[in-house]
């Protein structure tokens, strides 16, 4: 299997972001917290976003400083290593 290009990784990020918007459309904070399926789906998408961002080279990241690379990596780390902080997901979704 050939490695994915940074452009393909960026497409993955954009697709996951659209999925998060679709999954949470019309939800408020309470609705989100009461829906474990949506919580898990959103967590998976954010984890995927973080993994895709991590695979993009520093050179590419430096070319696009306006992209919140560190935030993408950070949310992935929270989800993987501090999974008990899931409530912070909706704050990210709302932005």
Predicted regions mapped to residue ranges:
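Solvent-exposed interaction patches of small proteins and small membrane subunits
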Residues: 1-95
């Amino acid at each position: 299997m050939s490695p994915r290009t940074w452009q393909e990784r960026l497409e993955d990020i954009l697709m996951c972001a659209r999925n998060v918007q679709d999954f949470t459309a019309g939800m408020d904070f309470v609705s989100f917290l009461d829906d474990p399926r949506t919580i898990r789906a959103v967590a998976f998408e954010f984890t995927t976003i973080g993994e895709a961002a991590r695979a993009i080279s520093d050179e590419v990241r430096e070319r696009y400083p306006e992209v919140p690379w560190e935030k993408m990596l950070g949310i992935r780390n929270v989800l993987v290593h501090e999974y008990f902080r899931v409530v912070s997901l909706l704050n990210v979704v709302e932005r």
